[in-house]
Amino acid sequence: MAPWPELENAHPNPNKFIEGASGPQSSIPDKDKGTSKTNDSGTPVAKIELLPSYSALVLIEEPPEGNDPWDLPELQDNGIKWSERDSKGKILCIFQGIGKFILLLGFLYLFVCSLDVLSSAFQLVGGKMAGQFFSNNSIMSNPVAGLVIGVLVTVMVQSSSTSSSIIVSMVASSLLSVRAAIPIIMGANIGTSITNTIVALMQAGDRNEFRRAFAGATVHDFFNWLSVLVLLPLEAATHYLEKLTNLVLETFSFQNGEDAPDILKVITDPFTKLIIQLDKKVIQQIAMGDSEAQNKSLIKIWCKTISNVIEENVTVPSPDNCTSPSYCWTDGIQTWTIQNVTEKENIAKCQHIFVNFSLPDLAVGIILLTVSLLILCGCLIMIVKLLGSVLRGQVATVIKKTLNTDFPFPFAWLTGYLAILVGAGMTFIVQSSSVFTSAMTPLIGIGVISIERAYPLTLGSNIGTTTTAILAALASPGNTLRSSLQIALCHFFFNISGILLWYPIPFTRLPIRLAKGLGNISAKYRWFAVFYLIFFFLLTPLTVFGLSLAGWPVLVGVGVPIILLILLVLCLRMLQARCPRILPLKLRDWNFLPLWMHSLKPWDNIISLATSCFQRRCCCCCRVCCRVCCMVCGCKCCRCSKCCKNLEEEEKEQDVPVKASGGFDNTAMSKECQDEGKGQVEVLGMKALSNTTVF
């Protein structure tokens, strides 16, 4: 007999059998009785099933490696095949497909409209504050302050075109130089990427979908931040963007042209203008330093007005201020003259929901913000569900291959540049990089578009939004043509420079790796995604802006040590990953620091505890409301919420004693197995309780 009988005829499949063990034998068909094997004594030996826990393979077999979470999932079609349907089923399938397509277009339309209303809501909430940021000209000469002002203003108004138009107006009025406006343009480029990051939060229900969607959204953020980290110091030292755009304007003669074609606005404006209409000139007037604009409302009341010029008697300080000597007289106290005065006559009111409301801008903004976020979330959920039901089987295979497959060798390197052109063209059509990237985010989440393909599409959207700005600048009046065109060209060449830095060489595509790392963290700790948004788009810009108000010495004194600390951590992390041998033993990992300084687990425990306490309080409120409802209704149809039932069940389960599980002599058995059988069998000379389920 072998020294290790458990290993005889071993096979990874637990359904295989071994020989020489006694116990309850399964029935052997008559045709197999003649082929049963015998042992040395000549007695027949039956084959019995070996429980997995009795096999030494449980100890020596390595677990299979997990699948890569970044691999695109197989969207299998579990429905009835087309060939298996009858005529009625085929007709119903066609109508279902048409209905799903119509619903998809409808939800996509509501999705884009909700983004437009969301932008208006942000302008109502923070538009005047954004204008005040621009009106503080004392710190605009600081490039770092200009950068964070661009980020904050674009985040507040949720529109890079609005912030760019404010900058153009200030440059045309000589309130701001082109050199000081370039860092603000860079900040606006960063701030516009927050929209699709917010959209990615709506897919937090599924961890793998959220991992891909959040990484696909933040690849835009990392590209913009990395480009600014390199190009802002370069621009501050050499002013290459200013000189390059000056050279372009002097080389080519530009004339006033037509505005960029409104393709998407023509479809969405009839609906969004029924909800809210804003007077965006108020923000520009606040930025220009007009004190009277602070008391104006951003909500547009009168859409049709007429300006009339009339002659009116006005008082002047002295006769020298009169229009002419013939139109000047005094009454002994004041000097009067006749002047032309322009009066605006209101003709017709706007037709939107809030035109007759007397609510302040902040209240209307909060209402629209809440409603638009709810609609945005609902539309995104339905779009993902519809895409998940449509993109199955052969259709999904064709689309995934079309979007993610490279050109054949030796032209594979051209695929990414074609994707950049496609992204630029699509953004030019919809006239908004936020709309294009936000619509692409759910496709990344469900696995139709890979992160590697989404990256060049996102870079193309950055180019597309600048071409729209260039066409809009060409439609500007003559006094603002040069300034607006130069700023649009600065934005264009900034994005071109970023692409040259972070795309042509595969090794330099750091945004993809950083976005995947952040996606892994956010999938494990989903609260970290919200922290990322608040920290990088609100707290950090506000902190830098506050330090800029205190002056250069304070900004340098606080910022330089923080930057040096970040660089030290990055260098140490790189050495730990690449060359750990040159480091002391203590510095080869982060265990010398407290756990909360190098791990998110303690913070996750705190947040989980806080959310569970909030859930219990919420459930208590639900239980009270439920009981009041039952008392009022006088029936037993009302039921408490699901969370209340779960809490009550958990409390009951804690009071039920758990019976100790049966013990096993075999060391390969798990110590915590439940005894569900009553029969006893003898296997390999050892007695054990039979188990129908092993945990």
UniProtKB/Swiss-Prot annotation:
The chain crosses the membrane at residues 91-111, 137-157, 214-234, 364-384, 409-429, 487-507, 527-547, 552-572. Residues 1-44 are annotated as: Disordered. It is found in: Apical cell membrane. Residues 112-136, 235-363, 430-486, 548-551 are extracellular. Residues 1-90, 158-213, 385-408, 508-526, 573-695 are cytoplasmic. Disulfide bonds join 303-350. It catalyses: 3 Na(+)(out) + phosphate(out) = 3 Na(+)(in) + phosphate(in). It comes from the Eukaryota. The keyword Transmembrane helix applies. Signal peptide: none annotated. Its main location: membrane. Highly expressed in the lung, in type II alveolar cells. Moderately expressed in kidney followed by small intestine. One of its GO terms (cellular component) is brush border. Glycans are attached at residues 295, 313, 321, 340, 356. Induction: Up-regulated by estrogen. One of its GO terms (molecular function) is sodium:phosphate symporter activity. One of its GO terms (biological process) is response to fructose. Involved in actively transporting phosphate into cells via Na(+) cotransport. Belongs to the SLC34A transporter family. This is Sodium-dependent phosphate transport protein 2B. It comes from Rattus norvegicus.
